[in-house]
Design a protein with these regions (language model features):
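N-terminal cap/lid segment of alpha/beta-hydrolase-fold proteins
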Residues: 1-27
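Polytopic alpha-helical membrane proteins, predominantly small-molecule transporters/carriers
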Residues: 36-38, 50, 64-69, 90
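The serine-hydrolase catalytic nucleophile loop
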Residues: 42-53
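Catalytic nucleophile-loop/oxyanion-hole region of alpha/beta-hydrolase
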Residues: 71-105
């Protein structure tokens, strides 16, 4: 498995930082984007996204997990984040993932409640949303 520290600039010029976990295979792979909740981090509650990313890589599936603006290692302060900011950050993360050479865009899966509204402005061939309610 390969673990990469990644970052990119969102549409507001802030740096979002995250972690990509890839299987040892070459070429494009099915890919999951994990999005944490309002006050979370890219590791998830009790490191659930870390554990899930490793389990997915063992099955040949890559994944990315980012800290939203104002959370974790990304730019900004928590008190400056907003739901609109979460929405646009999610869109920017989806767009970033779709441009990566290792992502099979046909098999890009978004996992988060916020994703249910954020993906509408990003064009994907296939999208599955998991909602825990």
């Amino acid at each position: 498995m390969k673990i990469l520290q990644v970052q990119f600039q969102n549409r507001n010029g802030h740096t979002l930082r995250g972690i990509v976990t890839l299987p040892d295979t070459e070429g494009k792979v099915p890919f999951v984007v994990h999005l944490h909740g309002f006050a979370g981090s890219c590791s998830g509650y009790k490191s659930m996204y870390t554990h899930l990313s490793r389990a997915l890589a063992a099955q040949g599936i890559g994944s990315a997990r980012f800290d939203f603006y104002g959370n974790g290692e990304s730019d900004g302060e928590f008190e400056d984040m907003s739901f609109d900011g979460l929405h646009t950050d999610a869109q920017d993360i989806f767009a970033w993932a779709a441009q990566q050479p290792y992502v099979d865009i046909v098999k890009l899966i978004i996992e988060a409640a916020i994703a249910s509204t954020a993906f509408f402005n990003v064009k994907f061939l296939s999208l599955i949303i998991k909602y825990k309610g």
